[in-house]
């Protein structure tokens, strides 16, 4: 069990970690040497492959965070259980920034999981006990994810408002209805003809054609215009 860590600072315990720690160039897990593989061979590896201070807990997909307190051999600070690996990784960063700012880490740069944690996480610059650090870390991580959700909701609202749908006018609806009527008229005429033929019956149709072929041609006594020719006029009169 870690003892009480007394830290005195001119800043109030609630002020965020600003210029002193934010201006330092902190290392990250992407620039620091890779993590050494676990020495345990008989147990399943639960540590996160990239993030520091993060390991899996059980089969429910939850993650826990626990950090080593710099300068205090064998002392670890438990930070809690989180739903995502990023939440546990952010808690690690907040704890390291708070301990470093208070002088527990020697005042130098610490290794973070995310480089932007140095200015996105509001952590105290001084603390009296490690319990204060744990409480400040929980508030910093909760505030970080609350601001992220608010930003995502704002961006989604702005993107939906910048692309309004074009309203349909009455002229567009009338032209669309007219085009539909014109395009459907040839098809309706063809359907009408097919319906007439089907109602007559193909047998009756061909029978009427045969009957017309058996009819005698009109009499030659009628002219082309239907008037009767009164006398036969010879073609040659000599």
UniProtKB/Swiss-Prot annotation:
Residues 9-22, 155-167 have a biased composition (Low complexity). Residues 1-41, 155-188 are annotated as: Disordered. InterPro entries: AP2/ERF_dom (IPR001471), AP2/ERF_dom_sf (IPR036955), DNA-bd_dom_sf (IPR016177), DRE1A-I (IPR045277). Residues 50-115 bind DNA. Residues 170-182 have a biased composition (Acidic residues). SMART domains: AP2 (SM00380). GO terms for cellular component: nucleus. Keywords: Activator, DNA-binding, Nucleus, Stress response, Transcription, Transcription regulation. Transmembrane segments: none annotated. It is found in: Nucleus. Induction: By high-salt and cold stress. Its main location: nucleus. Pfam families: AP2. One of its GO terms (molecular function) is DNA binding. Transcriptional activator that binds specifically to the DNA sequence 5'-[AG]CCGAC-3'. Binding to the C-repeat/DRE element mediates high salinity- and dehydration-inducible transcription. Confers resistance to high salt, cold and drought stress. Belongs to the AP2/ERF transcription factor family. ERF subfamily. This is Dehydration-responsive element-binding protein 1A. It comes from Oryza sativa subsp. japonica (Rice).
